[in-house]
């Protein structure tokens, strides 16, 4: 399928959209007492409720036909088989091999990659155990208390999110910090909380040349040497996740403490690899492998479940329905678990870097809208920030709610007061978004409060909620490493399915590279005395304003 909008099934969906558009979900629930039963799925220890969507019995069969006509199943099998489906970079897409707990062979260019995967996992286990046990000592003989991961993009967002989510599994007395931004404030404020004698730095850069990461790493090294003095001590406090042994050695890191990963692992899918070393140290390798197990179980589900019972496929198709037919341009990620506070930011990269494309696989301009804007916040914080827009704004914003049935923490009356309030709010929001509040209902409510006459008529229209706002809800028992692995893998595969239907390459990121190319040219010019004239008038003006303000003041 080169252009999905030209296909008969796309036209069928467009016609069906016109039929569904005037329908109200609250009426659908009233007419069909089995709606939840029909449009929910319990699988892999999760409940997926997609009944609060603007769909009828005819919608999903049409969407499943779209998936089959787009050859989603064939592309899925090609990915798992190690074919180089990332054709613009001539790379396989095999983050799934990193969590292949069956250990069955996975081939790239005729070579089974599983021995290398297992070798690095064993290296991670040995090293992380030595840190956690105190066997590994810093230069002064003290055990490590703080681990600072220096990376950016996929080398940061995944580990940050996972460590935050799985904090209940962390070892007491061992802290994880993450530095990504080239803004020196990020590193400086992190180092303020660390002691050079007890801090380990993980420098995560495949090439060991990434500008932001290596600038931060060099500054961290200088900070460390102000206390340690002897450069030989660097080897006890710095390790690398890289493939560039020469540059790692020049930095002062022992080659034995270089952890490898491969070009068939995309950055935004790399937390499953050695990039997850900070996770393994923080929560322990056993729990890290439970994370892998969760991802693997969803891989099996994605590969083997029919499309009609396939969680990532259903979520992907609902996204297509709203993105391409209803014109929704964003998706709100709303985790009702404070541990998942960074999950929306993680999914921003996973989704927007993957499917933010306007060129199809055949090099032509895509004729339909592709990746949505991903945003969100942990509940209930978001309720007091942006839910107003979702409820009463004039944009359609589909929402993904996710919620554990049990908390890790016992708080409040009977030990579950806080969690019950959280659950009640989550369920209430999905209900309110779906059913809304009619003019008559709002009027009855105001009359019951004693309002009459002009006061009632003035306030009444502002109390109406249109409803018909779609949402998906994912419930799970508890936020464990395995459950988190499942959630991440579900969204990975959802993103993949959407990219196939849109006929784009979800695995390159040339948009990230372009700005960096220009920045490399601009950087030395910021220190030159002469005015900048090379760029457009705006960019020249910004650069020259910087020069006038800093050079004249001597800074």
From Swiss-Prot:
Enzyme Commission number(s): 5.3.1.9
A Gene Ontology term for the protein's cellular component: cytosol
Principal location: cytoplasm
GO molecular function, one term: glucose-6-phosphate isomerase activity
Pathway entry: Carbohydrate biosynthesis; gluconeogenesis; Carbohydrate degradation; glycolysis; D-glyceraldehyde 3-phosphate and glycerone phosphate from D-glucose: step 2/4
GO biological process: gluconeogenesis; glucose 6-phosphate metabolic process; glycolytic process
Keyword Ribonucleoprotein: no
Catalyzed reaction equations: alpha-D-glucose 6-phosphate = beta-D-fructose 6-phosphate
Subcellular location: Cytoplasm
Pfam families on file: PGI
Catalytic residues identified in the record: 353, 384, 516
Gene3D superfamilies given in the database record: 1.10.1390.10, Glucose-6-phosphate isomerase like protein, domain 1
Keyword Magnesium: no
Keyword entries, A-Z: Cytoplasm, Gluconeogenesis, Glycolysis, Isomerase
Annotated family: Belongs to the GPI family.
Function: Catalyzes the reversible isomerization of glucose-6-phosphate to fructose-6-phosphate.
Name of the protein in its database record: Glucose-6-phosphate isomerase
